[in-house]
């Protein structure tokens, strides 16, 4: 059954709209056509979402290793999709030190969003460097993702609203944890989740830090911020923590452990996806969410996307078209 389902997935992806090998953020599940959910400019390739897709496909490929026709076809399909992603196209111009998030077939680089860490896009640079046909130079890891040029510093300082970490490196101590890399005190927890679904942070060390250790510190900082609970929000504590991206009462926001980015909304995925970093603290959150709040937080498909006990609200989904 798993093999048949995966053949259906790869067959669909082969026929879906692609833009220099990259897929769009949202795809119509019936037709494979692009859904410009975020507006008319969002009608082309999304390199970051493409990288999330491919870390999953490449990981799954390792499991389908039998020499039967169906599993061979899965491997061939994934190989073809993978080899035809034109990572280097998304540099925008030949000597660019950065990758760019979007490209539109009729509006080109109108969104013009450079990929600069620290955020969820590390996996994009890693896969682009490994690209078998259209790869980028490994030097772009430091010139793009970990850039320390003035533009990158301004970008980080702007979204973080602090100077901490604007150089990509940080070095400050928060709640007893010395953070080597990251803007502010780490940001929303999906930064330490998304890129590491296919990339093992234990085994990845650059000239600044080991990323399992650095990510673990971010998870601990997030929990301790919630224990301190500067905003006085209902429920926060050692078993209710994990600020990250989610829907909330008024829209969508990437919640993070800073007062100006925290409105009392908690997403179960924050603590639960941090199990590899904080197994004991994550288990406390899991038990609390299920045993004490399961009546409204647990549904047919598991935990709901987010809840806010201060305003008595639970939410079902995130970024659903």
Model-predicted segments: where are they?
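Ser/Thr/Asn(+Pro)-rich, low-complexity disordered segments
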Residues: 1-319
């Amino acid at each position: 059954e798993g093999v048949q389902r995966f053949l259906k997935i790869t067959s669909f992806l082969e026929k879906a709209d692609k833009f220099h090998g990259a897929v769009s953020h949202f795809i119509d599940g019936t037709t494979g056509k692009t859904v410009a959910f975020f507006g008319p400019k969002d009608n082309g390739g999304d390199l970051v979402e493409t990288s999330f897709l491919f870390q999953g496909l490449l990981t799954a490929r390792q499991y389908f290793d039998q020499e039967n026709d169906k599993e061979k076809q899965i491997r061939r399909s994934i190989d073809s999709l993978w080899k035809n992603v034109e990572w280097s196209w998304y540099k925008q111009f030949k000597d660019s030190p950065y990758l760019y998030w979007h490209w539109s077939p009729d509006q080109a680089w109108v969104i013009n969003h450079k990929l600069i860490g620290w955020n969820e896009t590390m996996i994009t640079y890693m896969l682009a460097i490994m690209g078998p046909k259209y790869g980028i130079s490994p030097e772009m890891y430091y010139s793009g993702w970990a850039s320390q040029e003035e533009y990158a510093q301004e970008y980080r300082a702007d979204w973080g609203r602090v100077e901490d970490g604007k150089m990509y490196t940080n070095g400050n101590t928060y709640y007893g944890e010395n953070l080597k890399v990251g803007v502010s005190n780490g940001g929303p927890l999906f930064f330490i989740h998304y890129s590491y679904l296919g990339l093992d942070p234990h085994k990845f060390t650059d000239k600044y830090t080991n990323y399992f250790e650095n990510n673990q510190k971010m998870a601990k900082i997030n929990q301790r911020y919630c224990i301190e609970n500067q905003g006085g929000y209902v429920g926060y504590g050692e078993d209710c923590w994990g600020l990250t991206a989610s829907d909330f009462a008024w829209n969508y926001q990437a919640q993070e452990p800073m007062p100006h980015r925290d409105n009392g909304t908690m997403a179960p995925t924050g603590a639960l996806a941090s199990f590899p970093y904080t197994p004991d603290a994550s288990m406390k959150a899991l038990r609390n969410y299920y045993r004490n709040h399961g009546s409204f937080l647990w549904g047919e498909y598991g935990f709901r996307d987010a809840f806010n006990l201060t305003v008595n609200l639970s939410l079902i989904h995130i970024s659903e078209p």
